[in-house]
């Protein structure tokens, strides 16, 4: 199979993965309108092509929170990454590390923080949910700091889990889910051998270490379902801001007023995100929400964006809409599932090449030159 894009990796991942895992990463909330709009709205962003400029010297690098990135891209936190490839968090993190960009470790990962961090040459980022179990939150923060994680990504758009219809149909949840997952694994022997057997343990590493006992997929659903906290407010985040010594990003911002609140709170950055269309169907796509947020807080706080990004061209579009950098989620999981670390490395190489092509054809030689001036203004 010829692989030349994240779309190709998606097809390859679908062939390799049991349906419950493919649809868990591929699906969204409710009827998935926002999931589709994330991609479609970004694809509708037209850029101004400029020609006959000397573009022989391009620089895709940026400085972000004191770190030098080879391109304006970071890997988003994705729960259960270690179910998509053998010790998947390690493989994805190594690929990001080799390409000179940050990997964000999910707090609900398969591999624990301590398994991943020592294998990298640069600090990784760490993501945390708002949970009723404040003991777990504090334990995770302490371990992340001890492991040298540089930046905290605090996800605030999951006070309750989204309604994901696909999960019930695919076997991730619903009646006889465990039996259905087992039957699917038998029908996908390459995954069953490489990940199902050789990728053990399939604990949720960070939660298991806190609870002192193994936590599998059923425990994952039960623990999170019981611990999401709908009472959370900005006040509840104050102890985290005081405890965490490094940069702190608030993930899940879609409204300019929330972005202004993040500035007042003292966050170092925000991530414009609708959780990849996995939480509330019918909200704005990140591409549509971003310009108003940038108008409200640009220059006061760093702005990152995810949801719908599938190519280097999409990265350039997001930056032109107002972001300082973009984050990849599904795209790298498709590559990881299809080809492990080498797949993620290859995808990131494609992303960087696509960024360079877009910069050349819009006549910008550095990321700082990608502004709203690149956007085609409709009459």
From Swiss-Prot:
Annotated substrate binding sites: 24, 129, 164, 278
EC number: 1.1.-.-
Family: Belongs to the FMN-dependent alpha-hydroxy acid dehydrogenase family.
Domain of life: Bacteria
EC supergroup of this enzyme: oxidoreductase
Function: Catalyzes the conversion of L-lactate to pyruvate. Is coupled to the respiratory chain.
Keyword annotations of the record: Cell membrane, Flavoprotein, FMN, Membrane, Oxidoreductase
Domain FMN hydroxy acid dehydrogenase: 1-379
Cofactor(s) recorded in Swiss-Prot or TrEMBL: FMN
Primary localization class, coarse: membrane
The name this protein goes by in its record: L-lactate dehydrogenase
GO molecular function annotations of the record: FMN binding; L-lactate dehydrogenase activity
Annotated GO biological process: aerobic respiration; lactate metabolic process
Reaction catalysis annotation: (S)-lactate + A = pyruvate + AH2
Active site: 275
Gene Ontology, cellular component aspect: plasma membrane
Species: Alcaligenes faecalis
Keyword Membrane belongs to the record: yes
